[in-house]
UniProtKB/Swiss-Prot annotation:
Disulphide bridges: C133-C141, C344-C361, C530-C542
Glycan-modified residues: N53, N216, N322, N546, N660, N690
PTM comment: Proteolytic cleavage by ADAM17 generates a secreted form. Also cleaved by serine proteases: TMPRSS2, TMPRSS11D and HPN/TMPRSS1.
Signal sequence interval, chain numbering: 1-17
GO cellular component, one term: cytoplasm
Protein name listed in UniProt: Angiotensin-converting enzyme 2
Length: 805
């Protein structure tokens, strides 16, 4: 037989084997899709019940349902791994197997998996039930929503904002710190068992594509694309930052540096994530009609249901479907009035089996009007790919899912659209000034959040990678916040805090880079859909509502779910395979030009050395080695605790004896910052019940002077080795370490010898005087041979005498 015959026979056998494997895999996946849908639905319903009614019983039910789903998924994942991907030709079957072969948390031991679930549930509960109390009225303790968020959205009181900001982090962040440390370790273990470098790498895997024709995409490429696009966005952000800083100086004139970073608690919400609420303080042309339509919504008696009905109308106008009847019956669109504790953070839910819901404590504001469009965009995506197999019912990548609703928000926010739904007067006319007002409001929400998002996720990636040891989490967090975002902490935070976890997405285990990529994608999508809708004019004026052609193109992409690479899905709509920041920059170009003119005489950028508390801080330098030599001890957390306690003692003494006031200062009232390895740091003091009430530096200095020796003694140091810069040394004797016995004995003996020598000298002088009185007039030196050069030791120059002391 010829060689070609055997080659043909081998190929036929290989094809038959592949066909057999593929058919078996197809049958396996069909069974999985049927069984998974029911178990997943039960788990999702239990999770919904817990999030809308936080009780121990609902937590127990959620954990039990989740455990059943996880056990089933783990079993099916192991079975999926028996099908070699190399023998699968059908792309859809292959993508499903690839997804199912990722074991997720099921690779952990039963004990560790249970512990991880316990940690995640605990973090969610702490976040949802945490409160901060008003220092001026300790009985007034507020949840985040509603309560603290109202202060952070509306208050112009610097101190009120500060206690709310600090109280939330002290209450929630500190509780979450030990849990988050465990979470990082367990998630990293899970990721590495799934063949990823760490959990950040695992998250980035959502963007990875292995495809032909140039549609592949790597996890490392995501990092590079984010870095590159951020560099392009940075000039626009820096000018927005400079403009906002100048406006904040008008509201808080003594609290803002002309060249410094922005205090984190002044930026419109609890995290400084969105600057939207700064618009009333920063509006360029205040005499123009207000494009924030919150007042109009209130005056027209809008409620939560009206807000979501208007969002639904928008989607329907472009040819997308209505919400289901179950959506309106089962969603939680307002905070319950029956006393239930709930997770208020807005989320869209695809529970499975055609059950779609939104959970949101909606308020009648323009911001929530746009948020409703965003959340309903998620539901539209969920409904569009519902016909896909279970494992492909997801966004092309996580950023796509976030972008869909944002596309609609771009149109819904335009003055033209707001006029059509009666929230702006028909007489409202657009000119250059109203255009700048509109673009600034958009930039506060969209541009202002990009560095926040980029920096937060970069920090987490570094933490998961081990590039930031847990002993430096907060130090690096605020270093990066100052350097990248131009935002500074209003009070210093040590390593007992966990500020990142004070954000919902961090406490609840969400990847966050999706909010960065979605912003880039949404402008790419908007530009493409506006072209399809035949929009003419600047991109920021485009409203795609009522364009069924644009809706049809969008729906084609949404219905793909995860069945094709996101690079291919993106290309089908926008004509490009990767992120491109140009449409975003084009959208804001008129504003960028205006900002550069406004900032012509202002400093653009920020000085990272400035701190809001610098003026009242005292610098400390400690020299252990020079003071104690080989007996120097290590400066550690315990020593810092002792220092803070010593200052608290000094403050108590000062207020008691000088002001006749009993103030219970404790170590937590002493705030330390900028600790350096060579032992230098700054500190300031606040009153015991109010972090926003800083004690003047001069009074702290007086308190230190009163208790200087007590402070020195606590550390076995003196004024020169425990130095408070700006406070002159006292006249108290320096601390001396104990002297050993042999030195004491030696000193006594040598002292006796010296006394003896002195007595001999004195005795000799007396005898000589007697001889002088009794002698004749002869030359007293006649008997002395001067050539011998003898010296009387009693008359030697003091500098020539050497001792062993």
């Amino acid at each position: 037989m010829s060689g070609s015959f055997w080659l043909l026979l081998s190929f036929a056998a290989l094809t038959a084997a592949q066909s057999t494997t593929e058919e078996l895999a197809k049958t396996f996946l069909e069974t999985f899709n049927y069984e998974a849908q029911e178990l997943s639905y039960q788990s999702s319903v239990a999770s919904w019940n817990y999030n809308t009614n936080i009780t121990d019983e609902n937590a127990k039910n959620m954990n039990e349902a989740g455990a059943k789903w996880s056990a089933y998924y783990e079993e099916q994942s192991k079975l999926a791994q028996t099908y070699p991907l190399a023998e699968i030709q059908d792309a859809k079957i292959k993508r499903q197997l690839q997804a199912l072969q990722q074991s997720g948390s099921s690779v952990l031991s039963a004990d560790k998996s249970q512990r991880l679930n316990t940690i995640l549930n605990a973090m969610s509960t702490i976040y949802s039930t945490g409160k901060a109390c008003n220092p001026n009225n300790p009985q007034e303790c507020l949840l985040l929503e509603p309560g603290l968020d109202n202060i952070m959205e509306n208050s112009k009181d610097y101190n009120e904002r500060l206690w709310a900001w600090e109280g939330w982090r002290a209450e929630v962040g500190k509780q979450l710190r030990p849990l988050y440390e465990e979470y990082v370790a367990l998630k990293n273990e899970m990721a590495r068992a799934n063949n990823y470098e760490d959990y950040g790498d695992y998250w980035r895997g959502d963007y990875e594509e292995e495809w032909t024709g140039g549609y592949n995409y790597s996890r490392n490429q995501l990092i590079q694309d984010v870095e590159d696009t951020f560099e392009q966005i940075k000039p626009l952000y820096q000018h927005l930052h400079a403009y906002v800083r100048a406006k904040l100086m008008d509201t808080y004139p003594s609290r803002i540096s002309r060249t410094g970073c922005l205090p984190a608690h002044l930026l419109g919400d609890m995290w400084g994530r969105f600057w939207t609420n700064l618009y009333p303080l920063t509006v360029p042309f205040g005499q123009k009609p207000n494009i924030d339509v919150t007042d109009a919504m209130v005056n027209q008696n809008w409620d939560a249901r009206r807000i979501f009905k208007e969002a639904e109308k928008f989607f329907v106008s472009v040819g997308l479907p209505n919400m289901t009847q179950g959506f309106w019956e089962n969603s939680m669109l307002t905070e319950p009035g029956d006393g239930r504790k709930v997770v208020c953070h807005p989320t869209a839910w695809d529970l499975g089996k055609g059950d779609f819901r939104i959970k949101m404590c909606t308020k009648v504001t323009m911001d929530d009007f746009l948020t409703a469009h965003h959340e309903m965009g998620h539901i539209q995506y969920d409904m569009a790919y519902a016909a896909q197999p279970f494992l492909l019912r997801n966004g092309a990548n996580e950023g796509f899912h976030e972008a869909v609703g944002e596309i609609m928000s771009l149109s819904a926010a335009t003055p033209n659209h707001l006029k059509t739904i009666g929230l702006l007067s028909p007489a409202f006319s657009e000119d250059n000034e109203t255009e700048i007002n509109f673009l600034l409001k958009q930039a506060l929400t969209i541009v202002g959040t990009l560095p926040f998002t980029y920096m937060l996720e970069k920090w987490r990636w570094m933490v998961f990678k081990g590039a930031i040891p847990k002993e430096q989490w907060m130090q690096k967090w605020w270093e990066m916040k100052r350097n990248i975002v131009g935002v500074v902490e209003p009070v210093p935070h040590d390593e007992t805090y966990c500020d990142p976890a004070s954000l919902f997405h961090v406490a609840n285990d969400y990847s966050f880079i999706r909010y960065y990529t979605r912003t880039i994608y949404q402008f790419q999508f908007q530009e493409a859909l506006c072209q399809i809708a035949k929009h003419e004019g600047p991109l920021h004026k485009c409203d795609i509502s009522n364009s069924t052609e644009a809706g049809k193109k969008l729906l084609e992409m949404l219905s793909l779910g995860r069945s094709e690479p996101w690079t291919l899905a993106l290309e089908r709509v926008v004509g490009a395979k990767n992120m491109n920041v140009t449409p975003l920059l084009n959208y804001f170009e008129p504003l960028f030009t205006w900002l550069k003119e406004q900032n012509r005489n202002s400093f653009v950028g920020w000085d990272t050395d400035w701190r809001p508390y610098s003026d009242q801080s005292i610098k400390v330098r400690i020299s252990l080695k020079s003071a104690l030599g080989e007996k120097a001890y290590e400066w550690n957390d315990n020593e810092m605790y002792l220092f803070r306690s010593s200052i608290a003692y000094a403050m108590r003494e000062y207020f008691s004896k000088v002001k006749n006031q009993t103030i219970p200062f404790v170590e937590d009232n002493v705030w330390v910052s900028d600790l350096k390895p060579r032992i230098s740091f700054n500190f300031f003091v606040t009153f015991s019940n109010n972090v926003s009430d800083v004690i003047p530096r001069s009074e702290v200095e007086d308190a230190i002077r009163m208790s200087r020796s007590r402070i020195n003694d606590a550390f076995r140091l003196d004024d020169n080795s425990l130095e408070f810069l700006g406070i002159e040394p006292t006249l108290s004797p320096p601390y001396r370490p104990p002297v050993t016995i042999w030195l004491i004995v030696f000193g006594v003996v040598m002292g006796a010898i010296v006394v003896g020598i002195v007595l001999l000298i004195v005795s000799g002088i007396r005898n000589r005087r007697k001889n002088d009185q009794a002698g004749s007039e002869e030359n007293p030196y006649a008997s002395v041979d001067l050539n011998k050069g003898e010296n009387n030791p009693g008359f030697q120059h003091a500098d020539d005498v050497q001792t062993s002391f």
